[in-house]
Regions:
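Phosphate- and other anionic-substrate recognition elements at nucleic-acid/protein interfaces
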Residues: 2-171
C-alpha cells in the first residue's frame, strides 16, 4: 500500500506499508483456490467463502488503520487506486478448480476484489487502472523517488504510487 500526494510531475510518497489480507491462522487463506481444488466441491465453496470473508475483514482493518495514520498526520484521504490484472473474465468455480492456471488468476482477482470492496466499505472511491495502461514514462517519472524515501523501492511500490496518483488526480 502506498499513499501519495502531488502529481506525476511532482510526486510525494506519504506512507508505504505491506498490508496483510490473508490470515495466516486460517488454513488455505493465502491460496484459497489452490486449497479448494483439493476438496470436494461442497467443501471447496465453503473454504473459498471463508477465505474471502476473512480477507475482507483484514482489508477493512488495514485500510482504516492507514487512513487513521494519514489523518493523524494532517492528510486528507480522498480515494483509493487499485492496479488491475489482465481483466479476463473468470468461469464458474468448478471450471476454476479444474484448471491450475485459473487457480492463480482467481486468487489474484479475489484479492483485488477484496481491496476494492474494503475501500468502498471505508467510503473511499476506487480508481481501477489496468496494469497494461501504466506507461514506461509514468513509471520513469517516479523512479527517482526511491532515492528520496530509501529502500525498498520495488516495482509493486512504483506501480502502486502511479495508481495512487491517478486516483488522486480523479478525486
Amino acid at each position: 500500500m502506498v499513499a501519495a500526494a502531488g502529481t506525476l510531475k511532482a510526486p510525494q510518497v506519504l506512507e508505504r506499508r505491506r498490508i496483510t489480507i490473508a490470515d495466516p491462522q486460517l488454513p488455505g487463506s493465502k491460496q484459497p483456490y489452490h486449497t479448494a481444488a483439493e476438496l470436494p466441491f461442497s467443501q471447496a465453496e465453503i473454504s473459498v467463502r471463508k477465505a474471502l470473508e476473512s480477507s475482507r475483514a483484514l482489508a477493512v482493518d488495514a485500510i482504516l488503520a492507514s487512513v487513521e495514520c494519514l489523518r493523524s498526520q494532517g492528510h486528507e484521504v480522498v480515494g483509493c487506486g487499485l492496479l488491475l490484472g489482465s481483466g479476463r473474465p473468470l468461469p464458474e468455480l468448478p471450471a476454476i478448480l479444474a484448471s491450475h492456471p485459473l487457480l492463480h488468476t482467481a486468487e489474484g482477482q479475489m484479492f483485488r476484489d477484496v481491496l476494492s470492496w474494503a475501500a468502498r466499505e471505508c467510503n473511499l472511491p476506487v480508481t481501477a487502472v489496468p496494469e497494461k495502461q501504466l506507461s514506461a514514462a509514468s513509471l520513469s517519472a517516479i523512479d527517482s523517488l526511491g532515492k528520496a524515501i530509501g529502500p525498498p523501492w520495488t516495482q509493486d511500490q512504483k506501480f502502486a504510487t502511479v495508481v495512487a496518483l491517478a486516483a488522486l488526480a480523479l478525486a
